[in-house]
Amino acid sequence: MPTARAISTAVLLSTATLLASSLTACAPSDQERDRQRGTGGTTTDAQALTNLRTQSLDWKPCAAPSPLQGGGEAPAALPDGTRWQCATLRTPLNWKDPSGETIDLALIRARTSGTPDDRIGSLLFNFGGPGGSGVATLPGLAPDYEKLRTRYDLVSFDPRGVGASSGVRCLDAGLPDEDEIDQTPDDGGDETNALVRFNRETAAACKKNSGDVLPYVGTTQAAQDMDLLRQVLGDDELHYFGISYGTELGGVYAHLFPEHVGRAVLDGVVDPTQDAMEEALAQAGGFQLAFEHFANWCAQQGCTLGDDAEDIVGLTVGLEETLDDTPLATPGGGELDGDALIDAISGALYRQDYWPALRVGLEAVTDDNGEVLEDLAEALGQHGRGGAPDDDTDDTDPDESNEDDAFRAITCDDSSNRYTVADVQSRLPDFLEASPLFGPGLAWSALTCDGWPVPGAAPAVLAEGFGEVLQDLT
């Protein structure tokens, strides 16, 4: 389930500043930080860490993204001729056992366009999810950050468990396609039982196929990977741009390594103090607000969906209910149901330049044409949204992206909550009040970790000494 982005720069600034101040209390001791970092232990561990920190990266021209990264073509050169370079970083499978097994993380970078005197260092991006491939995403979004490249090397990576970084797989030929499962059951019977069964069977498939890595794909371990990357890149500080889930990853990094935090932007801040249910509720409100902004814009543009934002929101709620009962057939044998409608809308809300396409798609649905929104959802997918899993991914196809599987694995590793149907049903009124459009889906997404085979725990995000979060990167 996707995570809402900030609506405006002003909101981002105030939210980020509040986050910084809220993370400074109750700081852990140096001994506790060393335990969390995995830097204590035996002489063997110390030597292993030294070897990891002094490794060299073998940068080469990037190939096309692998199927697990979402596929596609090799990234084209930037307008000034700069070629994208890719490498792998060797890191411990388990940071609490740094002398044990290692895994490789996929990296990508574009060198700065500035002079050596202008260069500040590397700027590391995480575009959210969790589950999104940074290696596949960064080239497509690079035009948005070209000004930053005058001062930084632009760098991203596939976090552990994602894409080409020991990507989690939950393949099982016996699993139904997720599109066949009603994600917002309202019958309290067969539909609800089918959703519960799907989540539990998916969890079992994840253990069967990726059980060795499942305990180690959480955000705390990923943050430790980022500090290793900082050192191997030769930077004294980590300069960081995190979007959506990437803000949580940045907050955990700041908790573990406050002395190495450089310039940082957290865009669309996720509140790290909320449990999974409260976070989902906040997301529902965020999506509702974003859709109301779209609806206001649409009305001002004279779209045929309604005379004002209230009319457009009401019409869309009605469309979702109608499509839930009677999906629209689309060319190629597909269909647009209520869940698919919400997926398409939520994906298009991440950027205002997607709004015209969303307007056209919704107007087409009112004329019984679901093809436009189906195509929009497919076009946005992971890379267009900046971090939201694409529910159209076929998790039984080994040639498909693993973004959904990674989303599930990282989410469940980062939470001790294992919600039940009763938990969801008791909170549904709150979600419906927050958003009749997005609330039900986000409420039922709380069942994602039901039956998960390994225990989880929320990452610590106290971040003593984090300082100012949002700064001018140029």
Give residue ranges: language-model regions.
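Catalytic-loop region of hydrolases
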Residues: P2-V11, C26-T184, G189, A457
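C-terminal motif of bacterial Sec signal peptides marking the signal peptidase cleavage site
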Residues: S21-A25
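Alpha/beta-hydrolase fold active-site neighborhood
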Residues: L49-N51, V313-L470
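Glycine-rich nucleophile elbow surrounding the catalytic serine of serine-hydrolase chemistry
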Residues: S133, A223-Q224, G242-A254
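Active-site-proximal cap/loop segments of hydrolase catalytic domains
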Residues: G167, A173-Q224, L228-V232
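A catalytic-pocket lid/entrance helix-loop region that shapes and gates access to the active site
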Residues: R169-I181, A254-G314, V360-E371, D375-R385
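Alpha/beta-hydrolase fold nucleophile elbow
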Residues: L233-Y245
